[in-house]
Curated annotation (Swiss-Prot):
HAMAP family: UPF0342. InterPro entries: Com_YlbF, YheA/YmcA-like_dom_sf. It comes from Bacillus mycoides (strain KBAB4). Coiled coil: none annotated. Pfam families: Com_YlbF. Gene3D superfamilies: YheA/YmcA-like. It comes from the Bacteria. Belongs to the UPF0342 family. SUPFAM superfamilies: YheA/YmcA-like. This is UPF0342 protein BcerKBAB4_0767.
Amino acid sequence: MTKNIHDVAYELQKTIAENEDFQTLKASYAAVQGDAESKNLFEEFRAMQLGLQQKMMQGQEITEEDNQKAQEVVARIQQDAKITKLMETEQRLNIVITDVNKIIMKPLEELYSAQQA
């Protein structure tokens, strides 16, 4: 009997939500949100990150001023233990998700590599 791919995806979603790294990420995010200074700095970082991404997507040049501001924000971020923990935890979870994505994409990879042989 063939499994419904959407059911499997929902099961994966549930498994990720129950994952220890995700639970740590939730707790770290709550800690940042619960500290006004950390929350404001994190929001500033996210806005800066989004602005730079939009510039790049629109083909606009990232100026020296943009780079300088980004470096200043990152330096302040690195001084905030709550945000640093949040980002480290997010990075660990991203590695897990990247690994899962490689597993999911393996049939396509095998298909296309077999076509080239």
